[in-house]
Regions:
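Non-catalytic pre-domain segments flanking phosphatase-related domains
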Residues: 1-26, 37-43, 72, 261-264
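Mg2+-dependent phosphoryl-transfer enzymes with acidic/Ser/Thr/Gly-rich catalytic loops
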Residues: 4, 15-17, 186-265
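Short loop/turn segments at strand-loop or loop-helix junctions that form parts
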Residues: 22-27, 82-86, 130-131, 136-141
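A general structural motif
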Residues: 17-19, 51, 77, 131, ...
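Metal-dependent phosphoesterase signature
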Residues: 13-36, 94-98, 102, 116, ...
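Short His-Asn-centered micro-motif
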Residues: 24-25, 57-60, 213-216
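Active-site phosphate-binding/coordination module
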Residues: 34-126
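Conserved acidic, metal-coordinating active-site core of Asp-based
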Residues: 121-212, 218-221
Length: 265
């Protein structure tokens, strides 16, 4: 597990009475494209989120999120930032949505990119349009787990996605381009980055300490602007998956139980 902060530093705060707000990344909760959350871990996560302010951040659409997390887990979060923060959901209801119209030049270039890809088993549609995001998956945005597995094996051998990401970022510097999963890349305008998520949480939780638990790819990719905006006693912890998160949550629950006992004396 890679961390910007020490694993056991949840209790090393500059403001002893500060509220802790947790922000989780979907890729850290459910590693693997199209996978569903482990049942036992889902119960543990729901218990944790019901007892403290927790948010979820993901680059995927809310419809895809619904297929990967059960209703009880989704509703345990104080809010869900979907489509790289372009949407805020609460209780399966959209609270806020910002939209962006991408240029014809960008669309045309993306069409050429997918047409020129050497991958032989492309299955349209290959481009998914979110409220302020464009996702490209050469296996197909509606590909089955089997199709994604076949494409992933091909991509691991040919390493085509990093080349496409670099080309797009160079061609369209006013957009952020990241490989947001093993099988897809994400395009967002720089004016609609996940910095919006930080501002929204800061406005809802003044003086709170934000503890962010992210997969390395997300922390260094689409969620980078959010993570970079954290400062002071805030923490960014890169986790390898549910096992790492379970340890972190267990530690936090024990720490809070100890604090509550001391406060009651």
């Amino acid at each position: 597990m890679l961390s910007h902060a020490e694993f056991t530093s949840f209790d090393s705060r500059s403001l002893s009475n500060a509220e802790d707000v947790f922000v989780f990344d979907l890729a850290a909760l459910v590693p693997g494209t199209c996978c569903q959350i482990d049942h036992d871990f889902a119960v543990y996560l729901r218990t944790f989120a019901n007892s403290r302010p927790c948010y979820l951040l993901t680059s995927v659409t809310y419809n895809e999120l619904m297929a990967r997390l059960p209703t009880s887990v989704r509703k345990a979060f104080r809010g869900v930032f979907a489509s790289s923060g372009a949407e805020l959901w609460s209780g399966d209801e959209v609270v806020e949505r910002v939209e962006h119209t991408f240029s014809d030049d960008l669309y045309e270039y993306l069409v050429k990119v997918v047409q020129n890809s050497a991958y032989p088993a492309k299955d349209a549609p290959l481009i998914e349009n979110g409220p302020a995001t464009l996702r490209v998956c050469l296996a197909g945005t509606k590909a089955s787990i089997g199709q994604l597995g076949t494409y992933l094996n091909w991509e691991n051998e040919h390493r085509e996605l990093p080349v496409i990401v670099n080309e797009l970022q160079s061609k369209f510097p006013d957009h952020d381009v990241h490989q947001d999963s093993d099988t897809s890349l994400l395009v967002t305008p720089v004016t609609m980055s996940t910095l919006r998520v930080h501002r929204r949480i800061a406005s809802e939780h003044a003086n709170a300490r934000v503890i962010s638990c992210m997969s390395p790819r997300s922390a260094n990719g689409f969620a980078g602007p959010f993570c970079n905006a954290l400062s002071g006693s805030d923490l960014v912890t890169e986790v390898g998956g549910p096992s790492d998160l379970s340890q972190l949550m267990s530690y936090e629950m024990r720490r809070k139980a100890t604090d509550d006992l001391l406060a009651a004396e």
